[in-house]
Regions:
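Short, flexible/disordered intra-domain loops and linkers
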Residues: 50-56, 88-92, 128-130, 170-173, ...
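Extracytoplasmic/secreted proteins, especially bacterial periplasmic and envelope-associated proteins
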Residues: 59, 63, 98-102, 134-141, ...
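Sec-dependent N-terminal signal peptides
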Residues: 3-13
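Substrate-binding cleft/loops of secretory-pathway carbohydrate-active enzymes
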Residues: 134, 204-233, 271-292, 335-344
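Mature N-terminal, pre-catalytic/accessory segment of carbohydrate-active enzymes
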Residues: 15-62, 66, 71-74
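Glycoside hydrolase catalytic-domain groove-lining segments
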Residues: 237-295, 315
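Aromatic/acidic polysaccharide-binding cleft in carbohydrate-active enzymes
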Residues: 273-375
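Substrate-binding cleft and catalytic face of glycoside hydrolase catalytic domains
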Residues: 68-240
Length: 375
């Protein structure tokens, strides 16, 4: 009986020992000097969802300001289409400013670093493989106007063409075409005496594996003078992050960045692309189909769940530990973008500011993952 008792105690001890996790903190090692910060994508809103134009009330702007003050973002990405403020080839920079200014005013008043840019804005013609110099010049003049004439010194970085490595991009994945556009645009910034005030960002590549790291490598080789900040976009699967594989993937891009330069995550979110996450993807599609205003093609319906917050925190910690200097989450507000139709929103946000006015009062409430990202 005594032997049995001893074995029983040893068994309990071994189970307890096996379950212990040792966490060590190295307070002396610096992972990243001069961290830019974390924040969110905050673009000018679509406003027309198929039944006439809506306007964001001052009360709703205040509501967003108050929520952002709780979050305390340090880094905001703002993307526009320069051609939306052009007519017959002429730039009208004041057009739409009453809307854009609310976003930039917040960032300027809170000392938030802004990555401004152009989604594509017919800056290139992939079929003819030519750059559109007139539009590129207009983009350079537009950002000069915002910085010099309107005083938005919070704009520190410029992102020309979203995800140029993708077949969905206006560049159709053609590196040489995009590189020519970057060189020309940088020359226009120099003409406008902005080269010392505004840094160009790139390659802005969307990645799921380490296979696209050559974009950073070739970028660092051919455009080292033009580029002031490196960035990529990641939409990993849940299993990729939870397993820790995500760190290995994004580290490949950090290692391709020249010494002394920084790289940030220009967009980050989750997509259930791996077979191991197929159950989540089926549920994601089921939820999107059940919600009248959700895009079936481009929505993350788990933003309503606490799980999404813990997963995003996991991804952020791995990104920081891999040596990145900031992360911009996709995205702040559902009401910014639609996909298949004007009322089929990309549901990815912390909320939908037009919930009470149009999409359902409950949609305007803050979702759980906002708090995880705010920590």
């Amino acid at each position: 009986m005594k032997i049995f008792y001893i074995l029983f105690i040893l068994g309990l001890w071994s189970c307890t020992a096996a379950s212990q996790t040792v966490v060590s903190v190295d307070a002396k090692q610096i992972i990243n000097e001069g961290y830019i910060g974390n924040g969110a994508q905050w673009d000018p809103y679509q406003l027309d969802y198929g039944k006439g134009r809506l306007n964001i009330s001052e009360a709703d702007w205040k509501k967003m300001y108050d929520r952002l003050d709780f979050m305390r973002p340090q880094f905001i990405r703002v993307m526009t289409n320069t051609t939306s403020v052009m007519q017959d080839g002429v730039l009208y920079p004041e057009r739409g400013l009453e809307h854009l200014s609310h976003i930039l005013d917040y960032c300027q008043s809170r000392d938030v670093t802004v990555m401004f840019g152009d989604w594509r804005g017919v800056m290139v013609d992939a079929r003819k493989e030519v750059i559109r110099e007139k539009n590129l010049s207009a983009a350079a003049e537009y950002v000069r106007f915002l910085i010099e004439e309107k005083g938005y010194s919070c704009i520190k970085y410029y992102n020309l063409v979203n995800e140029p490595n993708g077949y969905w991009s206006s560049t159709d994945g053609k590196y040489s075409l995009w590189a020519r556009a970057i060189r020309f645009f940088y020359g226009e910034l120099q003409k406008n005496k902005l080269a010392g005030k505004l840094s160009v960002v790139g390659p802005d590549a969307a990645i799921w594996t380490a296979d696209e790291a050559w974009w950073v490598d070739i970028f660092a080789t051919h455009l080292k003078d033009e580029i002031g900040l490196y960035d990529i976009h990641t939409y990993p699967s849940k299993i990729t992050v939870n397993s820790g594989e995500y760190t290995d993937i994004i580290r490949a891009y950090k290692q391709a960045v020249p010494a002394g330069r920084k790289i940030v995550m220009g967009e980050i979110g989750f997509k259930f692309v791996e077979p191991a996450d197929s159950v989540y993807q089926r549920e994601n599609l089921r939820r999107a189909a059940a919600k009248p205003y959700a895009s079936m093609d481009d929505s993350q319906m788990f933003v309503y769940d606490f799980m999404y917050g813990t997963d995003m925190a996991d991804a952020l910690f791995q990104t920081v530990n891999a040596g990145y200097s900031g992360s911009v989450v996709w995205m702040l507000d559902d009401a910014m973008h639609a996909k298949e139709a004007p009322d089929k929103l990309k549901v990815w946000g912390f909320w939908n500011i037009f919930g009470e006015e149009y999409f359902g009062t409950e949609e305007e409430e803050v979702r759980p993952w906002f708090y995880a990202w705010s920590l």
